[in-house]
Amino acid sequence: AVPPSYADLGKSARDIFNKGYGFGLVKLDVKTKSATGVEFTTSGTSNTDSGKVNGSLETKYKWGEYGLTFTEKWNTDNTLGTEIAIEDQIAKGLKLTFDTTFSPNTGKKSGKVKAAYKQEYVNLGCDVDFDFAGPAIHGSAVVGYEGWLAGYQMTFDSAKSKLTKNNFAVGYKTGDFQLHTNVNDGSEFAGSIYQKVSDKMETAVNLAWTSGNNSTRFGIAAKYQLDSHAAISAKVNNSSLVGVGYTQTLRPGVKLTLSALVDGKNINAGGHKLGLGLELEA
């Protein structure tokens, strides 16, 4: 089997902790597709604490015959982005991406060239991030064999001529169980466990520890599928923050998400957060 990219190691556990929640936000996502195959994604978010509203628009066109994908992005910070990707054309398993952003307000520009190559037992990635000070090179590699996974990730800053990121990861993955551990820059240690208990129930545990301050972070989360249209999620961490979420598919293409974050140490003090999300797809 093809192993996941380094960024996707431990993703199943992270999804149980992150998906189905949107504390302190009112969010609307709309996805549509034109007759010519152009995909439009519009997103709007309002922060209930600050009152700040953010919006974004993305258009994507896939030219399947040539393995090309064109993406245009815009957000309310007035940042424009263009991405061109070509996959499985030069070589099978190879994806090349050219990504640029431009902010007319500040005149700031950025550019990235990304290369990803995946085959049986191996997943490689190399990104070059162009900056005025000098390019930064991000590299990653994951190898997998019979469920075992090992990965390495680095960033080399050419302006400083040194490694600014140096991460290792080891994991084990089966159909319904995943174990993942990683060490970041030799100082941050983390681990996660994901288990699909049944067709309806998924659980996850994560643990993180940073050397030097002896602070250990711990969390446990679960997701239960009530039926084909509804699911509930819950999570708690060692800071006594309790999160609950409810996701309901009202009808095909319409999904509602309700979530709440409760501070277990200060239940009567207020400061709890609510979230509302609506996804429309046509």
Swiss-Prot record:
The record marks 72 as: Involved in hexokinase binding. It comes from the Eukaryota. It catalyses: chloride(in) = chloride(out); K(+)(in) = K(+)(out); a 1,2-diacyl-sn-glycero-3-phospho-L-serine(in) = a 1,2-diacyl-sn-glycero-3-phospho-L-serine(out); a 1,2-diacyl-sn-glycero-3-phosphocholine(in) = a 1,2-diacyl-sn-glycero-3-phosphocholine(out). Expressed in skeletal muscle and oocytes. NAD(+) binds at residues 241-243, 259-263. One of its GO terms (cellular component) is mitochondrial outer membrane. One of its GO terms (molecular function) is voltage-gated monoatomic anion channel activity. Keywords: Acetylation, Ion transport, Membrane, Mitochondrion, Mitochondrion outer membrane, NAD, Nucleotide-binding, Porin, Transmembrane, Transmembrane beta strand, Transport. The keyword Protein transport does not apply. The modification N-acetylalanine is found at residue 1. Coiled coil: none annotated. GO terms for biological process: monoatomic anion transport. It is found in: Mitochondrion outer membrane; Membrane. Signal peptide: none annotated. Pfam families: Porin_3 (PF01459). PROSITE patterns: EUKARYOTIC_PORIN. The keyword Ion transport applies. The chain crosses the membrane at residues 25-34, 38-46, 53-63, 68-75, 79-88, 94-103, 110-119, 122-129, 136-144, 149-157, 162-174, 177-184, 188-197, 201-210, 217-226, 230-237, 241-250, 253-262, 272-281. Consists mainly of a membrane-spanning beta-barrel formed by 19 beta-strands. Non-selective voltage-gated ion channel that mediates the transport of anions and cations through the mitochondrion outer membrane and plasma membrane. The channel adopts an open conformation at zero mV and a closed conformation at both positive and negative potentials. There are two populations of channels; the main that functions in a lower open-state conductance with lower ion selectivity, that switch, in a voltage-dependent manner, from the open to a low-conducting 'closed' state and the other that has a normal ion selectivity in the typical high conductance, 'open' state. Belongs to the eukaryotic mitochondrial porin family. Monomer, homodimer and higher order oligomers; formation of higher order structures is necessary for scramblase activity. This is Non-selective voltage-gated ion channel VDAC2. It comes from Xenopus laevis. The gene is vdac2.
